[in-house]
């Protein structure tokens, strides 16, 4: 369905219509997030879920992540480089890394091969925040595994 300004829209119910950002807007969001994080004076971990950003931005049905199908979520756009990844996540990452100051030692960025609604993605962020609050945070702690890649 046509949504606002040509966006894909999913009419969830009478009261809720889901419209997602375009890939170009995702790039702009990445730029803006980077500019804000460039000022960080305390530890910052930034996790980018590469397999989708919402229940409707998903490659295939998964009721536990919020999309029962049929088929891919209504706002899913696969990456040409890696079809299992969201094109929006890829564009966000490009805008983000292109504007992030590489000399700020307080920032670490992870590209995570998981969906935002994946319990493992949420556990990763929880553990990182817990470590920050307990004073046990250090850069690169969560690089283990094939789903997580520290890109900065």
Residue ranges of model-derived segments:
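Metallocofactor- and cofactor-centric catalytic cores in central/energy metabolism, strongly enriched
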Residues: 16-152
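Redox- and metal-dependent alpha/beta enzyme cores, enriched for Fe-S-associated oxidoreductases
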Residues: 1-14, 57-61
């Amino acid at each position: 369905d046509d949504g606002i300004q040509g966006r894909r829209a999913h009419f969830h119910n009478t009261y809720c219509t889901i419209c997602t950002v375009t890939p170009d807007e995702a790039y702009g969001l990445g730029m803006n997030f980077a500019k804000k994080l460039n000022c960080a004076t305390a530890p910052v971990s930034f996790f980018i879920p590469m397999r989708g950003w919402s229940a409707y931005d998903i490659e295939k049905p998964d009721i536990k992540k919020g999309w029962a199908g049929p088929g891919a979520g209504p706002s899913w756009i696969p990456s040409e480089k890696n079809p299992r990844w969201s094109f929006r996540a890829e564009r966000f990452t490009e805008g983000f890394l292109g504007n992030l100051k590489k000399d700020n030692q307080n920032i670490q960025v992870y590209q995570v091969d998981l969906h935002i609604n994946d319990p493992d993605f949420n556990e990763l962020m929880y553990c990182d925040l817990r470590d920050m609050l307990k004073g046990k945070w250090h850069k690169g702690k969560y690089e283990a595994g094939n789903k997580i890649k520290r890109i900065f």
